[in-house]
Amino acid sequence: MTNLRKTHPLMKIVNSSFIDLPTPSNISSWWNFGSLLGICLIVQILTGLFLAMHYTSDTLTAFSSVTHICRDVNYGWLIRYMHANGASMFFICLFMHVGRGIYYGSYMFLETWNIGVLLLFAVMATAFMGYVLPWGQMSFWGATVITNLLSAIPYIGTDLVEWIWGGFSVDKATLTRFFAFHFILPFIVAALAGVHLLFLHETGSNNPSGLSSDADKIPFHPYYTIKDILGVLLFILVLTSLVLFSPDLLGDPDNYTPANPLNTPPHIKPEWYFLFAYAILRSIPNKLGGVLALVLSILVLAVIPFLHTSKQRSMMFRPLSQCLFWILVADLLTLTWIGGQPVEHPFIIIGQLASILYFLLILVLMPITSLFENNLLKW
């Protein structure tokens, strides 16, 4: 009799994805982040579900309902901080996952990569709307500033912003619809992640060398299930340490003040994982230009496959490209730092230079360096 997991219509999908999946024998721990992102999503959906049971999406009671969750609900504080810090962990894993894709040339799987970029946009939208829900000062002003950016769109901008707000300012209608979208989007993300996996399994995984691994495959289980468990344990260690020892480390103190439309906080800034894009937005004096740069800072990822000029897929054997890659990482860290600083000298000029360098590296320097490396190989 054939094994049930290989014949049952549902079980064989799981089997071909997580058990008998032929996997390259040499993939490193950088390939752990896919499974970690799946776990992040599950944790966020579950904690979010329990938070939604106690949360009220009304401007008068939203802030109080979050306080009630933390004080009166059994382990409500734990659920709330797991959800808030889980988002930070989600983005850490996302950035590592995308960075791995750029370094090892995984973007050559076009469909998988493009759905990944779409997933990044969807997760960013979800996180932004989630940040508005506690209805603290930074929630309110963050929502006001970011939604207001759409008014830079010519002709339809102002109408579009008022349509999104459901009125003439961020108010009850805005909060209610943001809650509705924040609830539905993670399920759309889950569906997209399924499609992401579907396309990945059409081609099989990439590996650090960037060479074909068809001649050397091993089953996913037990080798990579065990390897992934190590990543999961480290992930749980970091998340629980954050939640139990310093839950507000990555948050903003202003969000413990209830939203007040009459009092603007001195420094409006988003959560840390949006600061790099926020710095790029602020570095351009023109409003429309800033909005375009903000969108392009993520959309530029979709262009990377078309700028691949190297004869080799991975950066493993390309020291010059490696050097540029780590400069890009340092540049993104600089942008993240600048995004959290006030708009004054010398931060303005540092932000502008870092923004120029970001686009210059991806669009110009990396493709040119790849061409140069191709010629280095001609003895």
UniProtKB/Swiss-Prot annotation:
Keyword Chaperone: no
GO cellular-component term (any): mitochondrial inner membrane
Cofactor: how bound: Binds 2 heme b groups non-covalently.
Listed transmembrane segments: 33-53, 77-98, 113-133, 178-198, 226-246, 288-308, 320-340, 347-367
Binding, heme b b562: 83, 182
Record keywords: Electron transport, Heme, Iron, Membrane, Metal-binding, Mitochondrion, Mitochondrion inner membrane, Respiratory chain, Transmembrane, Transmembrane helix, Transport, Ubiquinone
Membrane topology recorded in Swiss-Prot or TrEMBL: Multi-pass membrane protein
Organism superkingdom: Eukaryota
Co-factor(s): heme b
PROSITE patterns, per database record: CYTB_CTER (PS51003), CYTB_NTER (PS51002)
Localisation per UniProt entry: Mitochondrion inner membrane
Gene Ontology molecular functions: metal ion binding; ubiquinol-cytochrome-c reductase activity
Secretion signal span: none
Family: Belongs to the cytochrome b family.
PANTHER family attached to this UniProt entry: CYTOCHROME B
Quaternary organization: The cytochrome bc1 complex contains 11 subunits: 3 respiratory subunits (MT-CYB, CYC1 and UQCRFS1), 2 core proteins (UQCRC1 and UQCRC2) and 6 low-molecular weight proteins (UQCRH/QCR6, UQCRB/QCR7, UQCRQ/QCR8, UQCR10/QCR9, UQCR11/QCR10 and a cleavage product of UQCRFS1). This cytochrome bc1 complex then forms a dimer.
Additional remark text: Heme 1 (or BL or b562) is low-potential and absorbs at about 562 nm, and heme 2 (or BH or b566) is high-potential and absorbs at about 566 nm.
Free-text function comment from the UniProt entry: Component of the ubiquinol-cytochrome c reductase complex (complex III or cytochrome b-c1 complex) that is part of the mitochondrial respiratory chain. The b-c1 complex mediates electron transfer from ubiquinol to cytochrome c. Contributes to the generation of a proton gradient across the mitochondrial membrane that is then used for ATP synthesis.
Name the UniProt record assigns to this protein: Cytochrome b
